[in-house]
Structure formats: structure tokens, C-alpha cells
A protein has these predicted regions:
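C-terminal motif of bacterial Sec signal peptides marking the signal peptidase cleavage site
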Residues: 16-18
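Long, intrinsically disordered, low-complexity segments
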Residues: 40, 51, 106-107, 166, ...
Length: 515
């Protein structure tokens, strides 16, 4: 990747610290950076640093990570109130304004993964340990490439790690063919699938995640046979199982349904360079500030910042009425466990409405910041109520992803019986009756009901060719109940602009069309 990303990786060797396991802190300065890829200890630290870098890419807790958050908000299911609304199909969706880390950080991940993979064969260590390190690095590299190509379409492909010897070599920068990119992704994942195990510690890459990513790659390539086979293998593998609907986003998300969950720990954390990481604010982003509601005649707020109502919140983006319309309000259990209730009860002992239903019917305020339908998937009952930052692990992929992808893959292959079996596994858990027919709309709707605001629907809609249509129909902006409006997404916006600084640095690499 040479000099065009040299400035992206300068400093990684001196700031990335992580852990021998996710909850055991290891300071990077215990080993000299010059020997990072020359010993078993150095390779382990390099892998832990790679995990930390990857976690930082997928988590959201500051403006530097707003790109990851963007994908939660820019779909047909969202109503955006503030903060990053100008970047969504509006004035700031341009090459010098969009979050550059969505391009920069995956290439950092790729470069460091390649360094680990290349160095491992020359290091004296147990074969089993070497193999484990390489397998995990190859999955992370494939994951990074999969996110890059699904975001930008036109990307660079380079597996040679940057070193002081090659950093300033002359390179011709040109987009790789999508066929070559997917072939590279698949080689990494196919190798990993042959050797990984399903049972791994929380936050560590296992066979379930590798197969899920391989299935996604196959779906992008319209290879539905491979996608279906990978989904089948996860579902029948015996390790990953659907859990009760109340457990999915409960206090412990490291359960059998989780294929991969990013781990955080406040005791060993406080910075993205430490084992416990620097937390995230996903819960605060999707939840209204109920504690700002006022009731005429009551001198105090009826609701105070408290764990059951999510505590401190930002109230930036919410589920919209289109998403609500997809649920059976009388039967679907997900309304109870994925969202805060519409009807609120006072929890302030000083209020006249303590432990009583707030007067009138929802909405309790015309200000969406104070009250609107809110997501509960990322609620953290253990964090201080007056703090938005959470150290609760959050799920990157879960078995429900696999069931819905498998349903689509089998449906596209013409295997309606298996497609319905997989779709109905999700429906039955939610308390719904079995579906007897299946089509693309049924898959889209179940995906929305089950996987809303888990960060992947934008890519799903893009892949099936429905993104622009769905966003233009249903995506909403607004700050009050009377100011809610739609948006206009243009066809070229299905791919992000490449950061202008990168275009300038590479010189010969073309910008994506119409940016």
C-alpha cells in the first residue's frame, strides 16, 4: 500500500496496545517496536493491536468514528434529528466532507494484518499458535476488504505490508476489478474456514464469523449456492443457537446467538489503545431524552436519568414510522424487547407522577429530542445513569443474520421450503405465525423487523438494488413532530466518495462518479 497510506500507519507501531485476551491489559512498551514482527510475543501483541484497531473502526463514540454510525442512520428505517444529517444525501456528502476513516482505517487494518500474515512463517513458535494468529488476521483482512468494496465499489487491492524499505516505492494507483477483490476475500476466508473452530472466547474470531462473512461475499457475487451452504453450516454446526428474545440484547450479549461481539471493559479501558477500549455511545444515540419531558403543573421533571430508561441520552436518530408499521403491534414480541415503550411512567420521587402513567397520550412532547419512539437494543443497565458512554459489549453479527441471509439465498436458489424454514425460525421466536409464502419483500420486511439498527441494512439494500428506492420513500429528517420530512437520494450515492486527501495523494486514482 506504499506511500499513499504511509501517513495512515505512521504511529500505529507506537500507539496500538491491546491485550493477550480482551480483558487482560498488556502495555505495548513491554516489547520494542523494532521486534514486533520478529518474535512470538511481538506477533501476539501485533494481533491484539489489530483487534483493537478493528474494534475502533466498528464502534462509535466520537466524531472520528461518525462514519460507522452513518450506516445505522442512513437507511429507510431511520428518522434523523441532528448531528450528522448534512452527510446523509445532503450538502456534506462530498469527497472533502465525508468521514475519511471509512477508507483510511480498513486500509490500516489490511496493512497490519498483512504484516502479521507475512511475518508469521519466519518466527520460531508452536505451529498451533502461529496458525491461530494467521487465521484471525486473515479474517480481519477479508472483513476490511468486504467493508471497503461494499462502501466504495472502486478500491485498491494490495496485500504487501508497508515497511521502511518499500514505503516510498513508486506505485501505479488504479481500481482493482471487483472480481479480483472478491477472489482475494474468498481466499482468506476459505483458508480460515478450513481451520477455525466455532468455540472461541468472547470477542475472538471464530468459524461462525468466518462463514458468515464468506456467505455475505457470495451474496454480493450472486453465488447463492455457496451462500446457502455457509449459512446451513453455521445453523447446523451445533454451537450457535438462537436464544430467547429477552436475552438477545440483555445484560450479557456473549451468548450462543452471537457470532462476534466487540468487547469493552471499563476497568482495563479508558482509551482505544488499552485492552478495555474506550466504550461506545450507541445506546445514547438512538434514545430520546425522556428526562427533559415537562408536565404542566408539575414543578419537577417526572422522569430522571435512570438505567431502565437508558440514562443520559443524545437523541440523534430514531426508528421511524415506516419501521413501526412493519410490526404486528398485538403479537410481535420484538416491540417489547427492541424498543422503549410508548407509554412512560414517572420515576422521579419528587414528581406528582412518580410510578404513575404520564398524563395524556403519547407523544408527550412535540420536541423529538425529548420524546419519540426509541431503540432499546443498546441499553446498558450497568453504566452510570448520568453518563452516555457505555462499556457494554455489542454484537457485530448474530445467528439471526445467518437465518435471514440463508432464507434469501435458498429462496434465490428456488428452495422455498428451506427459505421458509429459516425465515419462520425468526418469526416464531418473535411470537408470529409461520409465513406460508416468501418473496423479496417478505425478506426485506423481516430483515427490518429483526435486524434494524444493527449497522448492516444499508449494505443489504444496496446489494439487492433497493437502497435508493427505499431511502427516498421512507428515510426521514426532523426535530419536531411538525417538521418531519423526507430526503432525496440520488443513484450515485450508493457508493461513497473516496476521501479527497487520498485522491490527491494517489494522483492517478479516479474519484467515484459525480463526486
Amino acid at each position: 500500500m506504499k506511500n499513499y497510506i504511509l501517513f495512515l500507519i505512521i504511529g500505529l507501531l507506537v500507539v496500538n496496545t491491546s491485550c493477550d485476551s480482551w480483558l487482560e491489559e498488556t502495555q505495548f512498551d513491554k516489547i520494542n517496536s523494532s521486534t514486533l514482527y520478529e518474535s512470538e510475543e511481538g506477533l501476539e501483541i501485533g494481533l491484539n493491536g489489530l483487534y483493537g484497531l478493528s474494534r475502533r473502526f466498528f464502534r462509535f463514540n466520537d466524531s472520528d468514528a461518525r462514519g460507522a454510525y452513518w450506516f445505522y442512520c442512513a437507511t429507510d428505517l431511520a428518522m434523523v434529528r441532528t448531528w450528522n444529517e448534512a452527510e446523509m444525501y445532503r450538502s456534506n456528502m462530498r469527497a472533502n466532507a465525508m468521514p475519511a476513516e471509512m477508507w483510511n482505517r480498513p486500509y490500516q487494518m489490511i496493512d497490519r494484518a498483512s504484516a502479521i500474515i507475512d511475518a508469521a512463517p519466519g518466527i520460531s513458535m508452536q505451529t498451533e499458535t502461529r496458525e491461530r494468529i494467521v487465521l484471525e488476521a486473515r479474517v480481519i483482512r477479508a472483513w476490511a476488504y468486504l467493508r471497503l468494496i461494499s462502501t466504495y465499489d472502486n478500491i485498491l487491492l494490495d496485500s504487501i505490508p508497508t515497511t521502511p524499505d518499500n514505503a516510498f516505492d513508486e506505485v501505479e494507483y488504479k481500481p482493482a476489478s471487483q472480481k479480483d477483490v472478491y477472489a482475494f476475500i474468498d481466499r482468506d476466508l476459505d483458508y480460515a474456514i478450513k481451520h477455525l473452530q466455532y468455540k472461541v472466547d468472547p470477542g475472538i474470531i471464530g468459524l461462525g464469523l468466518a462463514r458468515q462473512l464468506r456467505a455475505e461475499s457470495a451474496m454480493w457475487q450472486e453465488d447463492y449456492t455457496t451462500a446457502a451452504a455457509q449459512a446451513d453450516a453455521i445453523i447446523t454446526g451445533g454451537h450457535h443457537k438462537l436464544v430467547g428474545i429477552s436475552e438477545i440484547f440483555g445484560n450479557n450479549v456473549n451468548h450462543s446467538e452471537s457470532l462476534m461481539a466487540w468487547q469493552f471493559d471499563e476497568v482495563s479501558g479508558g482509551s482505544h489503545t488499552l485492552a478495555g477500549g474506550d466504550g461506545h455511545v450507541l445506546g445514547a444515540c438512538f434514545q430520546a431524552r425522556f428526562y427533559e419531558i415537562t408536565i404542566p403543573g408539575d414543578p419537577v421533571a417526572p422522569i430522571i436519568e435512570e438505567a431502565n430508561y437508558g440514562g443520559n441520552a443524545y437523541g440523534w436518530t430514531y426508528p421511524n414510522e415506516y419501521l413501526r408499521s412493519l410490526y404486528d403491534k398485538d403479537k410481535d414480541k420484538r416491540l417489547q424487547f427492541y424498543f422503549y415503550p410508548d407509554t412512560l411512567y414517572g420515576n422521579n420521587p419528587a414528581s406528582a407522577y412518580y410510578e404513575k402513567k404520564l398524563p395524556g397520550d403519547p407523544p408527550y412532547s412535540t420536541q423529538l429530542r425529548q420524546y419519540t419512539w426509541s431503540l432499546m437494543k443498546y441499553r446498558d443497565l450497568s453504566k452510570p445513569a448520568k453518563r452516555a458512554l457505555s462499556y457494554k459489549p455489542f454484537i457485530a453479527y448474530r445467528l439471526a443474520d445467518t437465518y435471514i441471509l440463508g432464507a434469501e439465498a435458498h429462496w434465490r436458489k428456488g428452495n422455498t421450503e428451506k427459505a421458509l424454514e429459516y425465515l419462520n425460525a425468526i418469526r416464531l421466536r418473535a411470537g408470529l405465525e409461520e409465513a406460508t409464502t416468501i418473496d423479496l419483500q417478505a425478506i426485506m420486511d423481516e430483515y427490518a423487523r429483526e435486524l434494524c439498527f444493527e449497522g448492516k441494512r444499508w449494505f443489504f439494500l444496496k446489494r439487492i438494488g433497493k437502497l435508493v428506492e427505499q431511502v427516498n420513500k421512507y428515510h426521514r429528517f426532523g426535530s419536531t413532530t411538525s417538521s418531519i420530512q423526507g430526503t432525496t437520494m440520488k443513484d450515485y450515492m450508493v457508493r461513497w466518495p473516496i476521501p479527497q486527501a487520498q485522491i490527491d495523494a494517489m494522483g492517478t486514482f479516479p474519484q467515484n462518479p459525480q463526486y
